[in-house]
Swiss-Prot record:
Classification via Pfam families: zf-C4
Zn finger (NR C4-type) start-end: 1-17
Stored Gene3D superfamilies: Erythroid Transcription Factor GATA-1, subunit A (3.30.50.10)
Example of a GO cellular component annotation carried by this entry: RNA polymerase II transcription regulator complex
Region (Disordered): 48-71
Stretches assigned to coiled coil: none
Source organism per UniProt: Eleutherodactylus coqui
Keywords, ordered alphabetically: DNA-binding, Metal-binding, Nucleus, Receptor, Transcription, Transcription regulation, Zinc, Zinc-finger
Protein's UniProt name: Thyroid hormone receptor alpha
Localization terms from the record: Nucleus
Predominant localisation class: nucleus
Family indicated by similarity: Belongs to the nuclear hormone receptor family. NR1 subfamily.
Gene: THRA
Free-text comment on this protein's domains from its UniProt entry: Composed of three domains: a modulating N-terminal domain, a DNA-binding domain and a C-terminal ligand-binding domain.
Length: 71
């Protein structure tokens, strides 16, 4: 199994993993896989929002001349 061929046949890959001793209790069922994916996406979104807030807080307030240019 290499980076190029690993997704060609997922069943073959799974069988090879089992054959070399992969623990079956580490295999996620569909509901656990979906829940894990959802948690990952929620964490990404939370980090994105935190980074946006951090960026906005670090921005200096425009001075009076800059406000005039904006208006």
């Amino acid at each position: 199994i290499d980076k190029i061929t690993r997704n060609q046949c997922q069943l073959c890959r799974f069988k090879k993993c089992i054959a070399v001793g992969m623990a079956m209790d580490l295999v996620l069922d569909d509901s656990k896989r979906v829940a894990k994916r959802k948690l990952i996406e929620e964490n990404r979104e939370r980090r994105r929002k935190e980074e946006m807030i951090k960026t906005m807080q670090q921005r200096p307030e425009p001075n009076s001349e800059e406000w005039e240019l904006i208006r």
